[in-house]
Amino acid sequence: MSDRNKEVKEKKAKHYLREITAKHYKEALEAKERGEKVGWCASNFPQEIATTLGVKVVYPENHAAAVAARGNGQNMCEHAEAMGFSNDVCGYARVNLAVMDIGHSEDQPIPMPDFVLCCNNICNQMIKWYEHIAKTLDIPMILIDIPYNTENTVSQDRIKYIRAQFDDAIKQLEEITGKKWDENKFEEVMKISQESAKQWLRAASYAKYKPSPFSGFDLFNHMAVAVCARGTQEAADAFKMLADEYEENVKTGKSTYRGEEKQRILFEGIACWPYLRHKLTKLSEYGMNVTATVYAEAFGVIYENMDELMAAYNKVPNSISFENALKMRLNAVTSTNTEGAVIHINRSCKLWSGFLYELARRLEKETGIPVVSFDGDQADPRNFSEAQYDTRIQGLNEVMVAKKEAE
């Protein structure tokens, strides 16, 4: 076998997923250089709109996570604070606002925006974040307002409200970019998006096996593609390849998790990107693997028609009632035979962290699994204590081991 053929044969899904992310940024930069209008987009803004129009957008949340993971989160956060923003403001927002102020990013080059696409189903603070960008740069902001849903289903009046904004966003983006909506293309994008979402969720579902065929932190790394390229065939193919690899790992007893899986845990919250390696290393020390999370799977948006598409964007984790949010976690724990939980009290994400103390109490009460929490931040390393985290994980391990010995 030639070296070239060997390389192709051995190429894994993770390599294709990295290439998709790199291509995403490259194409946006090239579009900007050609004089096309490009935008910054919220992670749970309906991606079907920009994809159908062929408009290039980048995702500040993805970008801020990459900057933080590469060790530059603190510098960017401090720059934003020097601009007048409080340390209490979301770390992703501070990183992104610093990039906006500087006008470029050394860590991961991105084009400056000609418009912003905002959606508040994952974060209410995002409205003010994007408003500031729009005002500072004097560019249009398109907002799709998703009402907080306290019900078990999404009512028809909510669907109509979201649909009206969806249609208006298309018209606004047509005017801004000069591109025209193609209904046939939209149908194709929806079909591909469903294929991507189903394969992504299929890959995540293999965590139910003991041992899990993958390290739970793999999902956090691969999630960027679920955000930025869900409507592309490349993403659908790569996620199918990933799911197939995990399926094969189940059959052969292999796993991307290094070492023996001794404990299975739920990880609740956004990853602390500046300390991702430290967190993973400490969990691995006790043989703990993340087998349950709702964060990564939040981008597996499933629908069969337009009404269901509107409803799907009203059912993401941060736009639903506490009881429904609890049900998501209970299902994640019970469906994967998870035995403990680690909860990230994220100083950047008030909307998410605000209910986590009660979630921890109810989760422990209704499942009987031990739960610990730690303080941290998704982008600002100053809000994370290695010593506190290490002590909490050590304590969780002791309780989990004692429970097993008592059974």
Curated annotation (Swiss-Prot):
Return one Gene Ontology term, BP aspect: L-phenylalanine catabolic process
Required co-factor(s) are: [4Fe-4S] cluster
Gene3D superfamilies xrefs: 3.40.50.11890, 3.40.50.11900
Provide the alphabetized UniProt keywords. Answer: 4Fe-4S, Iron, Iron-sulfur, Lyase, Metal-binding
The entry's free-text remark on the cofactor is: Appears to contain about 1 [4Fe-4S] cluster per heterodimer FldBC. No flavin could be detected in the FldABC complex, and the addition of FAD, FMN or riboflavin to the dehydratase do not increase enzymatic activity.
GO MF annotation terms: 4 iron, 4 sulfur cluster binding; hydro-lyase activity; metal ion binding
Q: Which InterPro entries match?
A: FldB/FldC_alpha/beta
Which EC number(s) does the record attach to this protein?
Answer: 4.2.1.175
Pathway-wise, it operates in:
Amino-acid degradation; L-phenylalanine degradation
Query: Which top-level enzyme class is recorded in the Swiss-Prot or TrEMBL entry?
Result: lyase
Note one Pfam family from the annotation.
HGD-D
Positions of the pro-segment in this chain: 1-4
Q: List the catalysed reactions.
A: (R)-3-phenyllactoyl-CoA = (E)-cinnamoyl-CoA + H2O; (R)-3-(4-hydroxyphenyl)lactoyl-CoA = (E)-4-coumaroyl-CoA + H2O; (R)-3-(indol-3-yl)lactoyl-CoA = (E)-3-(indol-3-yl)acryloyl-CoA + H2O
- What family, per the record? Belongs to the FldB/FldC dehydratase alpha/beta subunit family.
Quaternary structure, per UniProt, is: Part of the heterotrimeric phenyllactate dehydratase complex FldABC, composed of (R)-phenyllactate CoA-transferase (FldA) and a heterodimeric (R)-phenyllactyl-CoA dehydratase (FldB and FldC).
Q: What does this protein do?
A: Component of the phenyllactate dehydratase complex FldABC that is involved in the fermentation of L-phenylalanine via a Stickland reaction. This complex catalyzes the reversible syn-dehydration of (R)-phenyllactate to (E)-cinnamate in two steps, a CoA-transfer from cinnamoyl-CoA to phenyllactate, catalyzed by FldA, followed by the dehydration of phenyllactyl-CoA to cinnamoyl-CoA, catalyzed by FldB and FldC. Requires the activator FldI to initiate catalysis.
What's the protein called, per UniProt? (R)-phenyllactyl-CoA dehydratase alpha subunit
What's the source species for this entry? Clostridium sporogenes
Lineage per the UniProt record: Bacteria, Bacillati, Bacillota, Clostridia, Eubacteriales
